[in-house]
């Protein structure tokens, strides 16, 4: 088997978290009498961790050095509401079960804070994804390779045997920086045209496509 390990992004790839994230953003904005953001506006800012998300959604009158209290408010609210509407995308659980049955090693690597990744992984995926890396001290977040390489270390897998699956430009860059082949998915927070523009050659339009792409790659 040429590829033995599949590493997944979380938000926009495995889980549709957009509404819960948007609700948390808008809770902070409402609290401070700032204009709220649409779901589309929040989705466009997702993928690059919470500091970037809040920078994009807060007014420019809030200086960069003033962001931290708003970030903490977001984290507190989201921590209590991260499972209100979140759910796996169609076919994801069956796809993960099939990969696991075929003997693939599986992991999540996400720019979501570790305090979000851990409970969501446990709630929705059980033991399907034994390694789940979120934003934490000591690891540079995506698109730096650190988080992916940490996951591969825990799985005892080399990059050349591993595939990264994600929905955004951050994921494409992460795969490249980590030395992994990339599969782009079109059901998340970005359009299919983005993957085409970035030169992604393996694009999944539904969860089953991930299985068929991997099967073809391993022939």
Residue map of PLM features:
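N-terminal helical cap/lid subdomain that shapes the substrate entry/recognition surface
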Residues: 2-94, 102, 118
């Amino acid at each position: 088997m040429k590829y033995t390990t599949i590493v997944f992004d979380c938000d926009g790839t495995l889980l549709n978290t957009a509404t819960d994230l948007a609700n948390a953003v808008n809770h902070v904005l409402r609290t401070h009498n700032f204009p709220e953001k649409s779901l589309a506006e929040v989705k466009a800012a997702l993928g690059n961790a919470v500091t970037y998300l809040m920078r994009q959604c807060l007014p420019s009158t809030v200086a960069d050095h003033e962001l931290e209290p708003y970030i903490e408010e977001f984290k507190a609210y989201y921590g209590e509401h991260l499972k209100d509407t979140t759910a796996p995308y169609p076919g994801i659980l069956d796809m993960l079960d099939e990969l696991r049955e075929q003997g693939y090693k599986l992991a999540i690597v996400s720019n979501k804070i570790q305090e979000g990744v851990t409970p969501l992984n446990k709630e929705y995926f059980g033991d399907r994804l034994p390694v789940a890396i979120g934003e934490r001290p000591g690891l540079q977040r995506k698109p730096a390779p650190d988080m992916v390489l940490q996951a591969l270390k825990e799985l005892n897998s080399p990059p050349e045997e591993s595939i990264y699956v994600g929905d955004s430009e951050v994921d494409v860059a992460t795969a490249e920086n980590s030395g992994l082949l990339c599969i782009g998915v079109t059901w998340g927070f970005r359009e299919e045209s983005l993957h085409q523009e970035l030169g992604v050659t393996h694009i999944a339009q539904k969860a089953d496509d991930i299985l068929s792409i991997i099967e073809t790659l391993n022939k």
